[in-house]
Amino acid sequence: MQRVHAFGDDALGDLDAVGLADAIRAGWVSRADVIEAAIVRTEAVNPALGGLAYEAFQWARQTASKAGSGFFSGVPTFIKDNIDVAGQPTMRGSDAWVPRNAFDDGEFTRLYLATGPVSLGKTQLSEFGFSASAEHMRLGPVRNPWDTDYTAGASSSGSGAFVAAGVVPMAHANDGGGSIRIPASCNGLVGLKPSRGRLPLDSELRRLPVGIVVNGVLTRSVRDTAAFYREAERIWHNPKLPPVGDVTQPGRQRLRIAVVTRSVQRECSPELRELTLKSARLLEELGHRVERVAEPPVPPNFPDDFLLYWGLLAAMQVRTGRLAFGNTFDRTKLDSLTLGLDRHASRNMHRLPKAIMRLRRLRRRTADFFATYDVLLTPTVADETPRIGYLTPTDYQQVMDRLMGWVAFTPLQNVTGEPAISLPLAQSADGMPVGMMFTADFGQEAQLLELAFELEEARPWARIQIGD
């Protein structure tokens, strides 16, 4: 077992993003010293973790020398390498083409940087974000800082590893099937998947027949996540959604909470079942009304429909690769998971229209569920965090069977558009973090953040730097 972190007695200390932003504003630390400390931390842990996709250290130094605006002004961060940053390549976790530098920032990049943080570069992900573990055959795996024998989860792998290891207090992530929440669970972080439409998307994602992808952040504290959504909302607000507002403390309302430990496919592992029920007992102690429910509000054909839609997204990358990425695109360099998903879609294209129709209708079923309950509690994933190698994309069918079993709970909210947050409320017997996922009705991020503040106060998370 090797635990890797960068926490130390430098300008970053062990501050979260809000604390660091406050320290910069008060003049206790300078932007330049903070950015330099984050660069040193990156260089110290990246050889062990493999989370860095592209470094922009010199650009970060130059940016730090300017008096920036925004609440998080001067706070170091990273951006996941599947959205554009002007002047930097976007490789999407693949080496199947020679990258070109982006001409402009993507829509979310502009919003994120407008809140003030300084990006040190881009973080690694699984190829196109399709796998829940970044284990590229040539680029190498992204390892978990709690124990480098284990995966950091995916697809926001590098962001999760770097935030957990103390390189930066907050990093960009996005989620099309669990890619914020799964790394949050694996790395002991707070990971909120917002409601569909809460934050801007680049144009190609807005045109999808089912809008499953959302942007967000990974943090170590609830207040960092809450502060980000408050600041983002001041810059960009969707008038069709209720505002998140300035959530700073637990809510007073006692909630009706349904607890589910079984997905459509299977019961979660015995250990995760017990940890979930332990979290349910904590909720009862806090005065919430908790009820065991046999299964989530999901039809039995949901996993097959989601997998087919996943395959469609892979086919779009494979079949339009030269158009999207240039003439250097070489599909023979794609990993077996991407190619296997493409084949799955091609063989079952006749089923796709009805699958999309059923996915679009799923929100009706969950709306009925949330007419009875305020919140749904499940484990974030169905099994303990796997070791590196378990999800390596060598044999398509084997890795797909393993993936679908492990990520059985997270895709639902991508299809329905509802918000869900993973909180590091537990640890497995081997000492790895375990996330509990809380889902609320569409647009109810504020309710989830209030509950998260309450749980963080009642059961503070384990800290990676304690017990070295």
UniProtKB/Swiss-Prot annotation:
Which Gene Ontology terms cover its molecular function?
A: amidase activity
Catalysed reactions listed for this entry:
a monocarboxylic acid amide + H2O = a monocarboxylate + NH4(+)
The enzyme's E.C. designation: 3.5.1.4
Query: Superkingdom, according to UniProt?
Result: Bacteria
Catalytic-site annotation from UniProt: 80 (charge relay system), 155 (charge relay system), 179 (acyl-ester intermediate)
InterPro entries this protein is in? Amidase, Amidase_CS, Amidase_dom, AS_sf
Question: What UniProt keywords are attached to this protein's entry?
Answer: Hydrolase
Record NCBIfam families? PRK07869.1
Give the similarity note: Belongs to the amidase family.
Report the protein name in the record: Putative amidase AmiC
Give the encoding gene's name. Answer: amiC
